[in-house]
């Protein structure tokens, strides 16, 4: 089925490499979190939500691995240790939920003080408007926390895009290359999986979504990873959202 013939009730979008450039995430957001994590922890170390995040970080299996790398590991958990561990996780690009939550809080400050603006490709706002005008719902599924997702779209270069979005999902619903995650999303959306179109740049995510019964299309944005021939043959590929501007709801046979 070509993009021009597709119908759906929900468009589920990934962020990095799909609505937003990979370079923004890796060259702007990640460095900002690394540069500001220690100061943020010093400012809010005694806050209950930060204490919970610190406790959760200590339960991450990689925490023991990180401490083993230190020449003189501290005998107690302190700000420097946690900040260093967060920087380590960012450098390893590990999708750890408490780290993602902490990143979201750090970014919130950056967006609030105007130091950050969320990048979205220029075709994204027009597509959101077209889909909403056609009666479709738009949801987001990203490894970044829901809070971070809302910041990108709420403080984007194109203005506040949150009014277009009806639901947000992060790794609390499951990891993005697992079939169960997409089954969980369909249940939470109260929607038949085959009526959900997932847009991503990662073949493994597209495959997991299809295994759960969703439709999936892969974005080939500038800077996205190259695809193998078998991956190109397995999925529909589009360069941007423009081929999907005419996406429509399925025909209700009772009204036809």
From Swiss-Prot:
The keyword Cytoplasm applies. Its EC number is 3.1.3.77. Transmembrane segments: none annotated. It comes from the Eukaryota. GO terms for cellular component: cytoplasm; nucleus. InterPro entries: Enolase-ppase_E1, ENOPH1_eukaryotes, HAD-like_sf, HAD-SF_hydro_IA, HAD_sf. Substrate binds at residues 142-143, 176. Its main location: cytoplasm. It is found in: Cytoplasm; Nucleus. It catalyses: 5-methylsulfanyl-2,3-dioxopentyl phosphate + H2O = 1,2-dihydroxy-5-(methylsulfanyl)pent-1-en-3-one + phosphate. It is an enzyme of class 3 (hydrolase). Binds 1 Mg(2+) ion per subunit. Its cofactor is Mg(2+). Disulfide bonds: none annotated. PANTHER family: ENOLASE-PHOSPHATASE E1. Monomer. This is Enolase-phosphatase E1.
């Amino acid at each position: 089925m070509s993009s021009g013939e597709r119908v759906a009730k929900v468009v589920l979008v990934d962020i990095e490499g799909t609505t937003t450039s990979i370079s923004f995430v890796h060259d702007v957001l990640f460095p900002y979190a690394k540069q500001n994590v220690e100061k943020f922890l010093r400012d809010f170390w005694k806050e209950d939500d930060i204490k919970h995040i610190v406790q959760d970080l200590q339960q991450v299996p990689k925490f023991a691995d990180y401490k083993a790398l230190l020449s003189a590991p501290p005998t107690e958990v302190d700000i420097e240790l946690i900040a260093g561990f967060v920087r380590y996780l960012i450098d390893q690009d590990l999708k750890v939920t408490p780290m993602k939550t902490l990143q979201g809080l750090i970014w919130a400050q950056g967006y609030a003080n105007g130091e950050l603006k969320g990048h979205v490709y220029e075709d994204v706002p027009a597509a959101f408007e077209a889909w909403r005008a056609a009666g479709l719902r738009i949801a987001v599924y990203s490894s970044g926390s829901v809070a971070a997702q809302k910041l990108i779209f709420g403080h984007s270069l194109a203005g506040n895009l949150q009014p277009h979005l009806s639901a947000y999902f992060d790794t609390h619903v499951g990891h993005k290359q697992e079939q169960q995650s997409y089954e969980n999303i369909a249940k939470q959306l109260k929607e038949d999986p085959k009526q959900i179109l997932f847009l991503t740049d990662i073949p493994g995510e597209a495959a997991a979504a299809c295994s759960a019964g969703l439709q999936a299309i892969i974005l080939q944005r500038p800077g996205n990873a190259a695809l193998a021939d078998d991956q190109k043959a397995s999925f529909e590929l589009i360069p941007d959202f423009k081929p999907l501007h005419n996406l429509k709801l399925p025909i209700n046979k009772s009204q036809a």
